[in-house]
Amino acid sequence: LYNNDMNYIRTIFDDICKNIGKKPILVLYGARQVGKTTLVKSVMAKFKNPLYLQGDDPKDALLIEGRSGRELVDIISGHDLTVIDEAQKVKDIGVVLKLIADNKKDAQIIATGSSSFELANKVSEPLTGRNRKFYLYPLSVKELAQACGARVIKNNLEEYLAFGSYPQIANAKTRQEKISLVKELAGDYLFKDLFLFGGIRNPFTFEKLVKLLALRVGSEISYSELAKEAGISRGTVLNYVTLLEQAFIAFRLRPLYTNKTKEINKSHKIYFYDVGIRNALIGNTDPIELRPDKGAIFENFFIAEMIKDRAYSGRNSEINFWRDRQGAEIDLVESSNAGKVIAAYECKWKETAAMPAPFKNLYPRATFTAITASNIVDQLALT
């Protein structure tokens, strides 16, 4: 069963609509092709006379570059909403947005960007207190289930584990189409902004490191070991990993610890926001049942979904992994900012799991859920 150009209602749609006007500028971050333009266009449909500017279009960019505050106000006057898509392409976008906010207190602007390191550098300082940030990720299980029903997602779980959930890939009609789309996306396209803005001198070395990281999903990583294998310095590895985080391609998970003598407290794990991208990076989109790395893919899929869910729900919590010095471990632990552990999850493709006794002793009030192929969709779609 393949979706046929489904229209997905994005979880943050209502939140964005409610926040327009509360702050002059809303900034929507997300990777390339994640659905930002589709989302802002559906927001625009609720307004009478919106203005849409495409930062990728030199004509649109020139319209607002190098203008005075008064000129910018004249350009957007008469429009009840202004959208600047791919705003990182507009020269001095932070100054442009600041001038609008300074000169039109009731401005209603949405700026989108696929490279937060660039847009954030240009936007954060000039707009302190006057902007609200939103993040858009590949389609979540919740969004997919709302569009086509949880049963369809359950029946096609292995497709999502192989190809991920970027909208165009979720909508592709054949397996072959999905393979070619995910390969194209995981090629230079997704990294285009990184090569443009990230100061990456050697794209070949960068891509080698990304592949090494993709092969280590779910394992604790050694930056020194990665540096040695990629033939670059440890500092460059750290810089590249930060760039991957800032482009919404990958993220680090840190360990939870309250007792340094019993629990590990320094190492990191790395995961990808989309398992399809991860699989394409290592050149393997084979069905999950045939794969030796199915446990790592399944774990990555669940953890990325929990990251999306936390972001969309606005929960003020921390997500970590846990391991003690004797080797007992848990894939994901969510805790409040005060360090109070709320819930622990262990991912097992088929078999079930129990809470490790050392964890239970340290965190007696935490709930524990074993996530398997049979309960993952209900766990993610219905909670």
What are these model-predicted stretches?
Residues 1-5, 137-311:
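Interdomain hinge/linker elements that couple catalytic modules in large macromolecular machines
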Residues 51-81:
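Short glycine-rich substrate-engagement loop in P-loop NTPases that contacts/grips substrate
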Residues 57-59, 114-119, 139-142, 257, ...:
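Conserved nucleotide-binding/hydrolysis micro-motifs of P-loop NTPases
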Residues 94-117, 124-126:
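Conserved catalytic/switch belt of AAA+ P-loop NTPases
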Residues 19, 74-77, 100-107, 126, ...:
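Conserved catalytic network of the ASCE P-loop NTPase/AAA+ motor domain
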Residues 76-93:
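Conserved P-loop NTPase "ATPase switch" module shared by AAA+ and STAND
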Residues 117-132, 148:
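Short regulatory helix/loop adjacent to the ATP-binding pocket of P-loop NTPases
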Residues 1-7, 18, 23-27, 31, ...:
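A cross-kingdom feature that marks ATP-driven nucleic-acid transaction machinery
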